């Protein structure tokens, strides 16, 4: 029953549908098609567009996948929670940058590792900058 239905669609209904389509002889003929003729062409154009997309999809660039889901990969992993406390009065310099991406080799001080991290993951993390106010 199912094969008979498929056979009928392919052998009878599809050729009849294609014969009724208002396909112009030239490319310029598409400009002279009426709205109702365009509406009759829409199913065919939709199927052709879908087949074209499915054909080129393997060649399209893949989306970047995030390399790792953990943020902190190596800093003080033996502690359940990493906390660094710095007394602001002890700041020697006027500007100090602290790491927020957990990739710094000089943690907790930023060594600009976030730049590479942002490129790899598409993230937008930056350092925490503390400025000493001079009165």
Curated annotation (Swiss-Prot):
SMART domains: ZnF_CDGSH. GO terms for cellular component: endoplasmic reticulum membrane; mitochondrial outer membrane. It holds the Pfam family MitoNEET_N. Its cofactor is [2Fe-2S] cluster. The keyword Iron-sulfur applies. It is a single-pass membrane protein. GO terms for biological process: autophagy of mitochondrion; regulation of autophagy. Regulator of autophagy that contributes to antagonize becn1-mediated cellular autophagy at the endoplasmic reticulum. Participates in the interaction of bcl2 with becn1 and is required for bcl2-mediated depression of endoplasmic reticulum Ca(2+) stores during autophagy. PANTHER family: CDGSH IRON-SULFUR DOMAIN-CONTAINING PROTEIN 1, CDGSH IRON-SULFUR DOMAIN-CONTAINING PROTEIN 2. This is CDGSH iron-sulfur domain-containing protein 2A. The lineage of its organism: Eukaryota, Metazoa, Chordata, Craniata, Vertebrata.
